[in-house]
Amino acid sequence: MKCRSCNTKLKPFFSLARMPLVNAFLKKADLKHEKKYELATAFCPKCFLVQLTKTIPPEELFTDYLYFSSTSASFLAHCEATADVLIKRLRLGKESLVLEIASNDGAQLQCFDKVGIPILGVDPAKNIARLANSRGIPTIPEFFTHAFAIHLKEHERVT
């Protein structure tokens, strides 16, 4: 295994063996078909980056994602505080555009929207993007790739 950042040989240090995806609430009959993935970490002795040793294909993680940001009161309070700081520090206003990658159900974006700052969310989970859109938070259900960034620059007034 090589470091994702500097390509140095990694040193594994912790493993939980094979684990199912989080928040996958299965019926008893489906448990025997549940996919499990290696969940282990490694340390890079050169750049000190701690990283997972295996990456789950994003399409498997986000097909039907079940975590919704807006269900946590403490996270919503954090979103408000973060928005207040960013609005002041960056002098955001009606001519700005706040683009959030992995925007989930739009909990953070709604803090900017309610004060009239234009927003756009990008989240690969189609079910969550659909919910965000139904709440008036414009959200594109896509993975944020280089090609998609170019598309945004050409079509969504993102510079």
Residue ranges and their predicted role:
Residues A125-N127:
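Conserved SAM/SAH-binding beta-strand->alpha-helix loop
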Residues P118-D123:
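Conserved SAM-binding motif I beta-strand of class I
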Residues D105-I117:
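Conserved SAM-binding loop of SAM-dependent methyltransferases across substrates and taxa
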Residues M1-S74:
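N-terminal juxtadomain amphipathic helix
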Residues A77-E95:
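Conserved alpha-helix/loop element of class I SAM-dependent methyltransferases that forms part
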Residues I150-T159:
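A short acidic, Gly/Pro-enriched loop at the edge of an enzyme's catalytic core
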Residues G136-A149:
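Conserved SAM-binding strand-loop segment of SAM-dependent methyltransferases
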Residues K94-N104:
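Conserved class I S-adenosyl-L-methionine
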